[in-house]
Regions:
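Non-catalytic substrate-recognition/targeting regions of SAM-dependent transferases
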Residues: 109-122, 138-206, 215
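C-terminal catalytic and target-recognition region of SAM-dependent MTase-like enzymes
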Residues: 335-398
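Non-catalytic accessory regions of SAM-dependent methyltransferases
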Residues: 1-123
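Conserved class I S-adenosyl-L-methionine
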Residues: 223-232
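Conserved SAM-binding motif I beta-strand of class I
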Residues: 247-252
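Mobile active-site "lid"/loop adjacent to the S-adenosyl-L-methionine
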Residues: 295-325
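S-adenosyl-L-methionine
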Residues: 256-296
Length: 398
């Protein structure tokens, strides 16, 4: 079936033609030729894009209200984006995750990388949290929901609270649109049990992206005292305890998140070795330092200090500050794990900020490893923004 009569054709400006290779997932507003017909295209509509030489670049979701005007759906210029097409993309995404994980707790769809631009789906057993973060995703959320239900999902939470939606000019809101979700969901990960509040928690309730970094930190923490700063629901700390850490102190400014961490510790059978501190992270680290309290391992996994390029320098200074205060708490030959989820901060800039902070504290340092998000968060080879997560493992020698 041809889509010739279905989708309007949009052209790129001549000066932009050679700047992109076929398969690049985004085209920006200033790359698009806006003629009378283009100006009438509504947010979320599907278009075909050609370069100035009439080269066919594929089928795209279009939004004239966003800086990212076009998001790739299919490189096949004749693709028809219907329920069958959506179902096919979901199955491809599911097949990858089934090969990776025994338990059904993971990022099921990671936006453009899974050919569903702006769609984020986190799976919690028979429950999913759907984030339609683009105009096309929002316009087609019912079709996406129908397709999800065909894969054994009973409950669907529609989470429309992301920063990305605001950039797309979309409304906010959160509701259960299928089934029932009345309490935090038990999540099994890295031999620990966590509890995710998918209705009131941060983002979708838990951070699946850190799973493999949790695992490495846990291996290094056996028999050790661990300080887990910006702990949220106990991410690094609980993984460490079930792997043999001696004691974990979890610091977070959110009392509800820490209460879920305590519940996870109880369910994991490690509550006697788990202590929470409801405090500002910097205040807590300063207090530990003033009390001469030191740890074999310190982990800091803060929120995004630099969500956009405009906040890059401010964010880098904040990461340097985290590195300074946390490195002062690490015993000689101990470990420091520093993380960033800021899209605007690449690995090199983040590493340099961390090293500046550590050396300001007078510490001699080795980098023993670094990592990103797990394989349920794949990265588009042409879009480095999807490699947002950076976790660097340091050993402090003195």
């Amino acid at each position: 079936m041809s889509n010739v009569s279905l989708y309007q054709t949009v052209k790129l400006k001549k000066t932009k033609t050679n700047l992109r290779r076929k398969g690049f997932p985004w085209y920006y507003l200033d790359e698009i030729v806006f003629d009378r017909r283009t100006k009438n295209i509504k947010a979320g509509e599907i278009v075909k894009i050609q370069d100035s030489n009439l080269g066919k670049l594929g089928v795209f979701a279009f939004n004239p209200n966003s800086k990212i005007a076009a998001r790739l759906l299919d490189v096949n210029h004749e693709a028809v984006i219907d329920n069958n097409w959506i179902r096919k993309q979901l199955k491809l995404a599911l097949d990858l995750r089934k090969n990776l994980f025994k338990e059904s707790f993971y990022r099921l769809v990671h936006g453009e990388v899974d050919n569903l631009p702006g769609v984020i789906i986190d799976r919690f057993g028979d429950t999913v949290v759907l984030q339609p973060n683009s105009a096309w995703a929002d316009l087609n959320k019912e079709k996406i929901t129908e397709s999800i239900m065909e894969f054994g999902i009973s409950n669907i939470v529609l989470n429309c609270m992301s920063r990305s939606r605001r950039l797309e000019g979309l409304n906010e809101g959160l509701t259960v649109i299928q089934g029932a979700v009345t309490e935090p969901i038990k999540v099994k990960m890295n031999k620990a049990v966590y509890f995710a509040d998918v209705l009131h928690g941060q983002k979708t309730g838990i951070f699946f992206d850190q799973r493999f970094n949790h695992e490495l930190a846990a291996k290094l923490s056996k028999g050790k005292d661990v300080l887990d700063v910006f702990s949220h629901v106990g991410g690094f700390g609980l993984a460490a305890l079930v792997s043999g850490a001696r004691k974990v102190f979890a610091v977070d400014s959110s009392a509800p998140a820490l209460s879920l961490a305590v519940k996870g510790a109880e369910e994991s059978g490690v509550s006697e070795k788990f202590e929470t501190i409801n405090s500002d992270a910097f205040d807590a680290m300063k207090e530990f330092f003033q009390s001469n309290r030191y740890f074999d391992m310190v982990v800091c996994d803060p929120p995004a200090f630099s969500p956009s390029k405009k906040t890059l320098n401010t964010g880098l200074r904040a990461y340097e500050r985290v590195a300074l205060h946390s490195s002062r708490l690490v015993k000689p030959n101990g470990y420091l794990v520093l993380c960033s989820c800021s899209h605007a901060v690449d690995l090199s800039k983040f590493r340099n900020a961390c090293v500046r902070g550590i050396t300001r504290a007078g510490r001699q340092v080795q980098i023993i490893s670094w990592g990103g998000a797990g394989p349920d968060h794949p990265i588009n080879s042409q879009l480095e923004q999807f490699g947002y997560l950076k976790s660097i493992f340091f050993r402090l020698l003195s």
